[in-house]
């Protein structure tokens, strides 16, 4: 059947009715097809979300895998002994501890120190632990060590170049449980009443729970020192000697004033560096004391006994000493 209407006619699928069927049947058909359409829309949304999430994963920076650049090195017994010795001398100055040990880096030393500190705190053996560094704006800043080239001034006419923080003026923990004084103070004459002196004072034994103390001229507060384990007594050979051989030191100083002794320079070359430094320190202090005005009365008293004229030929060193001339060291 051909329609006579010249205008086009667009069929509405929702409102179109089938001949012989009412509009209610058409509505039922449209309602039955709506669940299929909604499920399709949900599936499309899920696919879109998956695609967007995959794009985000690709856009994220890939994390670089962790690689160990250097394998862990175990600490040997000599290295650990040097580490303990450096803790006594430098506290938490890791750069100086690194230079003292020589075979470990600062990172390795700090890691080893952290483990050692935790072990000591748990065991409760009373080992020496250096105090932690305070914050920058702390009321009591961390005490700084005196530089090696800094000379300490003693009140009065005497000058002292001793350095309390130098390793040569400190006892090893197993060598003695006493306080020691520097060779400069030990060589000071009794007429130096205005100079500060440090006397030898015995301390309680380590078994009573007390720790050894180390005295410092810059601070009056004693710092706790601890005793080593028994194993350190067998490892003295590989550890550095920090105590001068005073018998050899004073023997050399006595030979300087002996007119029959010679080859002093050769003897100095054969001595350990710590003994050489102690000899030079004592000789410098002796020359300062002899040239001070306080010694003038003693020099006149000795001159009254005419020691200079009696020993002018046999004991030239004594005569030169009384006349403020430094003794000559023969080579």
From Swiss-Prot:
* MF annotations from Gene Ontology: DNA binding; DNA-binding transcription factor activity
Q: Which GO terms describe its cellular component?
A: nucleus
Picking any one GO biological process from the record gives:
circadian regulation of gene expression
Against Pfam families, the record matches this protein to:
Myb_DNA-binding, RVE6
Coiled-coil blocks: none
Q: What is its main location?
A: nucleus
Deletion consequences: Monochromatic blue and red lights have opposite effects on the period of triple mutants rve468 lacking RVE4, RVE6 and RVE8; lack of blue light-specific increase in expression of some circadian clock genes. In long day conditions, rve468 plants have a larger size and a delayed flowering. In short days, rve468 plants exhibit long petioles.
Tell me which UniProt keywords the record has, alphabetically.
DNA-binding, Nucleus, Transcription, Transcription regulation
> Boundaries of each HTH myb-type domain copy?
67-121
Q: Which residue pairs form cystines in this protein?
A: none
**Job description of the protein:** Probable transcription factor. RVE4, RVE6 and RVE8 are components of the circadian system acting synergistically to regulate flowering time, redundantly to regulate leaf growth, and antagonistically to regulate hypocotyl elongation; their action seems independent of ZTL and HY5.
Provide the protein name. Protein REVEILLE 6
Q: Which organism is it from?
A: Arabidopsis thaliana (Mouse-ear cress)
Phylogenetic lineage: Eukaryota, Viridiplantae, Streptophyta, Embryophyta, Tracheophyta
């Amino acid at each position: 059947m051909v329609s006579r209407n010249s205008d086009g006619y667009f069929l509405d699928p929702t409102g179109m009715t089938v001949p012989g069927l009412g509009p209610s049947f058409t509505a039922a058909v449209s309602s039955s097809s709506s669940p299929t359409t909604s499920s399709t829309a949900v599936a499309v949304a899920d696919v879109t979300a998956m695609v967007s999430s995959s794009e985000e994963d690709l856009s994220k920076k890939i994390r670089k895998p962790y690689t160990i650049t250097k394998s862990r090195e175990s600490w040997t017994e000599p290295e650990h002994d040097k580490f303990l010795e450096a803790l006594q001398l430098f506290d938490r100055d890791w750069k100086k501890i690194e230079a003292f040990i020589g075979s470990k880096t600062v990172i390795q030393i700090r890691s080893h120190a952290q483990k050692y500190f935790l072990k000591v705190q748990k065991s409760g053996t009373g080992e020496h632990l250096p105090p932690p560094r305070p914050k920058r704006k702390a009321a009591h800043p961390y005490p700084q060590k005196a530089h090696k080239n800094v000379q300490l001034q003693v009140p009065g006419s005497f000058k002292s170049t001793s350095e309390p923080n130098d390793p040569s003026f400190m006892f090893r923990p197993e060598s003695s449980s006493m306080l020691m004084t520097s060779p400069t103070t030990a060589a000071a004459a009794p007429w130096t009443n205005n100079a500060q002196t440090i006397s030898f004072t015995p301390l309680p034994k380590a078994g009573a729970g007390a720790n050894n103390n180390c005295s410092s001229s810059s601070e009056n507060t004693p710092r706790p020192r601890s005793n080593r384990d028994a194993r350190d007594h067998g490892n003295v050979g590989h550890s550095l000697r920090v105590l001068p051989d005073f018998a050899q030191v004073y023997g050399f100083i006595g030979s300087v004033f002996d007119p029959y002794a010679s080859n002093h320079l050769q003897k100095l070359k054969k001595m350990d560096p710590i003994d050489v430094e102690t000899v030079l320190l004592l000789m410098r202090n002796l020359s300062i004391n002899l040239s001070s005005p306080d010694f003038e009365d003693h020099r006149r008293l000795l001159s009254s006994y005419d020691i200079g004229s009696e020993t002018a030929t046999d004991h030239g060193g004594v005569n030169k000493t009384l006349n403020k001339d430094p003794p000559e060291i023969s080579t």
